[in-house]
């Protein structure tokens, strides 16, 4: 083989039984499963009996109100909000874990406040935000009073007067919008003192030893890895700090972007120190994080939004991927098929997660993966700000806007942030559609593996066997899918309410999601530290990667919006009405 295999995302090789304990993909699965099992033991083993009692009480109120009125009343929403306050991660154990995994916090002008915030500084922040909170609270209280009057008028008419019902719904909707703003302002007056200067070194040691287990079995030099991991972790912490700076956060330049930027600055100026290089295990970190992501893809949530969401995510996405790849090959004449495929998958499916899976399936070069992820991060930062602003300016319905953003913005976190800017319904629809789209990570990886074996690297006159496809298929995707299936079963058995409390607000947000965030940050840091500008330069010849991304994303925007409108407002308006 002419190419240097160390420059490929996943090396060629035949499958053996020993792969289960000597290969990176399997270790990503085992480590991911260890975290998820630990999460289940910590949060699911002994649920508080108060949860079930409070859920039953809230559901009784909601059922009674749903029968009493043809719309969601104030009492209905109050009960719904009471359920939303129940979180397994609010237990003593959950709070301890959260404190240990805490990343650097937000800051404006003093970066040290990202690590240590004194009681006096916390009180100063609270005092500065108090006036805005009080104004938001007064507005919310006034909106609630107006909604009470409107609902009382509708109730007095026996909820038989359509005009009064509509007026009540309108006032309640205004109250909900003002309440959301008040809650956002309230967070800023509840700032607490913290000090993570001691927990961060401990977290570094624990994470280093955690990944070192796999490194030992894979035949790497563990002491050298651990020494190098210190350097990677320190850069990752700086990236976390920069990503939480208020201005950077506002403009969407998050942790991932800073991890790559800082890493590349080091690599292309003073050079990445040799002692750090053994810890630049990009795929190892990100694949472990992707296994954890699988647990967040729950089938009951997919079913909840119905066929419209599935059409937006599962019909549009493969069309855009295939058309973009063909456009790159036939029109742009992209010299690298692997770069073309990775960019197409990155842009059409779900950003970096799809990029790493696709790069593994088609044996893309690491520089091609870096370039693709870089494009994704830049456009994600732009779209998460521009799209919600545009949607608001043209008066697009929240559900349509949420579906549009969920199907087009690459990163899951950016989708949630953009959806929250529009409102509760937009956030729910956007996040759910992105989650449905995440399921395609495994499907796309398998499809690309088959296509590359059968069409791109095939030998004339020789048929492709399943063994060859299996050898190429990125095995960590099996961990992603297994985690999704297991947690979907657990979630379904608990019921939607208890699943939200114990799984989503327990195992996931209390343990696996924070760790996934750290693992992704480590991976992006390693990408930056391993990237040489000179090696990337020739890929930008003629600007073809940028043109491919812009054209593909433009097609994605048009097709997703069209499909969302047809599915949510023409074919299935009754489902839209229930959201």
From Swiss-Prot:
Annotated Gene Ontology cellular component terms: plasma membrane
Task: Establish whether keyword Transmembrane helix is in the entry.
Answer: yes
Q: Which residues form a coiled coil?
A: none
Question: What compartments host this protein?
Answer: Cell membrane
The membrane-topology field of this record reads:
Multi-pass membrane protein
Q: What domain of life does the native source organism fall in?
A: Bacteria
User: Is Translocase there in the keyword field?
Assistant: no
Q: InterPro entries of this UniProt entry?
A: UPF0324_pro
Membrane-crossing residue ranges in chain numbering:
26-45, 193-215, 225-243, 250-272, 305-327, 369-391, 430-452, 473-495, 515-533, 546-568
Keyword entries, A-Z: Cell membrane, Membrane, Transmembrane, Transmembrane helix
Q: Which family does it belong to?
A: Belongs to the UPF0324 family.
In Swiss-Prot or TrEMBL terms, this protein is called UPF0324 membrane protein DVU_0943
């Amino acid at each position: 083989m002419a190419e240097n295999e160390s420059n490929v995302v996943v090396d060629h090789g035949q499958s053996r039984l020993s792969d289960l304990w000597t290969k990176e993909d399997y270790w990503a699965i085992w480590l991911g499963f260890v975290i998820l099992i630990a999460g289940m033991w910590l949060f699911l083993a002994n649920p508080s009996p108060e949860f079930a009692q409070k859920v039953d009480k809230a559901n009784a109120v909601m059922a009674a109100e749903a029968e009493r009125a043809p719309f969601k009343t104030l009492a209905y929403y109050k009960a719904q909000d009471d359920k939303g306050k129940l979180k397994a991660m609010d237990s003593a154990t959950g709070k301890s874990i959260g404190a240990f995994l805490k990343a650097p916090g937000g800051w404006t002008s003093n970066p040290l406040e990202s690590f240590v915030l004194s009681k006096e500084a916390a009180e100063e922040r609270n005092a500065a935000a108090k006036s805005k909170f009080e104004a938001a609270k007064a507005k919310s209280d006034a909106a609630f009073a107006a909604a009470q009057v409107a609902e009382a008028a509708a109730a007095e008419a026996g909820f038989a007067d359509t005009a009064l019902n509509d007026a009540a719904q309108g006032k309640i909707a205004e109250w909900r919008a003002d309440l959301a703003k008040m809650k956002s302002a309230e967070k800023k007056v509840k700032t607490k003192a913290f000090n993570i200067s001691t927990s961060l070194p401990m977290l570094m040691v624990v994470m280093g030893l955690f990944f070192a287990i796999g490194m030992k079995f894979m035949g790497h030099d563990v002491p050298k890895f651990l020494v190098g991991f210190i350097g990677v972790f320190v850069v990752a912490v700086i990236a976390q700090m920069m990503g939480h700076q208020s201005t950077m956060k506002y403009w969407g330049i998050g942790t991932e972007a800073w991890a790559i930027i800082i890493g590349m600055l080091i690599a292309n100026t003073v050079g990445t120190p040799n002692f750090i290089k053994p810890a630049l295990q990009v795929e190892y970190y990100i694949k472990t994080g992707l296994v954890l992501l699988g647990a967040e893809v729950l089938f009951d949530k997919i079913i909840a939004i119905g066929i419209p969401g599935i059409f937006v995510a599962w019909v549009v996405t493969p069309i855009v991927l295939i058309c973009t790849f063909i456009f790159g090959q036939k029109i742009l004449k992209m010299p690298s098929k692997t770069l073309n495929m990775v960019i197409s998958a990155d842009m059409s499916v779900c950003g970096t997660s799809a990029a790493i899976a696709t790069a593994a399936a088609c044996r893309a070069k690491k520089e091609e993966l870096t370039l693709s992820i870089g494009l994704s991060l830049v456009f994600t930062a732009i779209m998460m700000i521009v799209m919600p602003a545009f949607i608001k300016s043209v008066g697009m319905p929240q559900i349509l806007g949420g579906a549009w953003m969920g199907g087009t913005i690459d990163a899951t976190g950016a989708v949630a942030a953009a959806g929250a800017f529009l409102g509760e319904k937009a956030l729910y629809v956007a996040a759910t559609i992105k989650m449905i789209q995440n399921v395609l990570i495994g499907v796309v990886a398998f499809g690309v593996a088959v296509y590359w074996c059968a069409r791109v690297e095939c030998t004339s006159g020789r048929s492709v066997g399943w063994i060859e496809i299996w050898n190429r298929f990125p095995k960590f995707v099996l961990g992603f899918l297994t985690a999704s299936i297991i947690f979907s079963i657990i979630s379904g058995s608990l019921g939607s309410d208890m699943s939200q409390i114990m799984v989503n607000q327990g195992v996931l947000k209390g343990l696996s999601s924070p760790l996934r965030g750290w693992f992704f940050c480590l991976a992006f840091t390693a990408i930056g530290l391993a990237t040489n500008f000179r090696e990337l330069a020739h890929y930008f010849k003629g600007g073809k990667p940028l043109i491919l991304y812009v054209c593909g994303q433009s097609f994605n925007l048009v097709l997703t919006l069209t499909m969302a409108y047809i599915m949510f407002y023409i074919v299935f308006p009754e489902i839209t009405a229930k959201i």
